[in-house]
């Protein structure tokens, strides 16, 4: 092989290698080989919300990596986060809600369940029963932070009143040792505009659901 032919062959080889062997045309630039580039997370936008039945002090809350206890109803949340905010008496979860400036017991729901009137009233009954303050606001004692267990709030008034954990919490931490009735709880929240708005919204959803139900009579049953 002459020197000229050798140089030409070597030059051709180098060109082919630099082009990826002549096949596939720069394989690393194909879409299937590009690294995923997810959108960067939005910066944290801390806001202050209010949990109100009356404003409650001493509720534990969790919102993503943000945790703490409410102070006169106030809690912190990230307005850029899609995580729900959940509220607890100790380790007893009352429910969770989409974050917002105002949250009431009637905005809370159990996982996989919508917010409801019955659960809202039962949460209100329990919170007001455990109130140790002599002011219009609600204050939970530090002892309630030791509470553990699970309560189902979406049950009838009577069933809720006989729930073992509810009875235990009332016996341990309620100043009067008595669970308030639904009527008593309703009177306490009657003048809270935020709570009444939440109740009105739930009633509207309920009415719309009922109006959409079609009843068909079966003539064979008459």
Placement of each model-derived feature along the sequence:
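Bacterial N-terminal signal peptides that target proteins for export
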Residues: 1-9
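Feature for extracytoplasmic/surface-facing segments of secreted or surface-associated proteins
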Residues: 25-72, 76-222
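An acidic-aromatic pocket/loop used at catalytic or ligand-binding sites
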Residues: 12
């Amino acid at each position: 092989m002459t020197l000229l032919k050798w140089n030409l062959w070597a030059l051709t080889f180098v060109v082919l290698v630099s082009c990826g062997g002549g096949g596939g045309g720069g394989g690393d630039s194909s879409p299937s080989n590009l690294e995923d580039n997810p959108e960067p997370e939005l910066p944290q936008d801390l806001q202050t919300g209010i949990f109100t039945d009356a404003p409650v002090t001493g509720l534990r809350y969790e919102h993503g990596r943000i945790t703490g206890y409410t102070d006169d109803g106030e809690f912190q949340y990230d307005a850029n986060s899609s995580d729900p905010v959940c509220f607890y008496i100790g380790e007893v979860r009352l429910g969770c809600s989409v974050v917002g400036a105002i949250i009431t017991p009637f905005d809370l729901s159990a996982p996989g369940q919508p917010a409801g009137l019955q659960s809202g009233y039962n949460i209100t009954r329990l919170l007001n029963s455990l109130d140790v303050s002599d002011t219009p606001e609600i204050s939970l004692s530090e002892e309630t932070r030791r509470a553990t267990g699970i309560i189902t709030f979406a049950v009838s008034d009577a069933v809720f009143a006989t729930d073992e954990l509810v009875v235990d919490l009332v016996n341990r931490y309620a100043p009067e040792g008595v669970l308030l009735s639904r009527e008593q709880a309703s009177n306490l929240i009657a003048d809270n505009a935020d709570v009444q708005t939440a109740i009105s919204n739930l009633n509207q959803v309920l009415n719309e659901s009922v109006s959409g139900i079609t009843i068909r009579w079966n003539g064979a049953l008459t």
